[in-house]
Amino acid sequence: MARVKRGIMVRKRHKKLLEQAKGYRGARSRHYKVAHEAVMHALADAYRDRRRRKRDFRRLWIMRINAAARLHGTTYSRLINSLKQANIEIDRKMLADLAVRDPQAFARIVEQAQAAVTA
């Protein structure tokens, strides 16, 4: 069997990883061994936080809806229940956006939902 020299491939792989570590402080951007560890941790954190971001935004929307709902004399859970009973299909993202940007429209939605429950 012929001898395989891997110098070119190793250099290419190291260069690619050091490119990913660009902007890191100190040895993390210059030394392969340290940079490799930093990049692996960064990729793991990014993967985890892409999933966490979805949860965080949902929590934020719920907090905003709850705060706006309490201004209209109801709570988040009662509002969501009345929206479902009134067959008003609006997601939490849109509801939170209305609560922040257009309080009058949010108030009308709350009134419609409460009217459907009492009727």
From Swiss-Prot:
It comes from Chloroflexus aurantiacus (strain ATCC 29364 / DSM 637 / Y-400-fl). One of its GO terms (biological process) is ribosomal large subunit assembly. One of its GO terms (cellular component) is ribonucleoprotein complex. Keywords: Ribonucleoprotein, Ribosomal protein, RNA-binding, rRNA-binding. InterPro entries: Ribosomal_bL20, RIBOSOMAL_L20_CS, Ribosomal_protein_bL20_C. The lineage of its organism: Bacteria, Bacillati, Chloroflexota, Chloroflexia, Chloroflexales. Belongs to the bacterial ribosomal protein bL20 family. The keyword Transcription regulation does not apply. SUPFAM superfamilies: Ribosomal protein L20. This is Large ribosomal subunit protein bL20. It holds the Pfam family Ribosomal_L20. Binds directly to 23S ribosomal RNA and is necessary for the in vitro assembly process of the 50S ribosomal subunit. It is not involved in the protein synthesizing functions of that subunit. GO terms for molecular function: rRNA binding; structural constituent of ribosome.
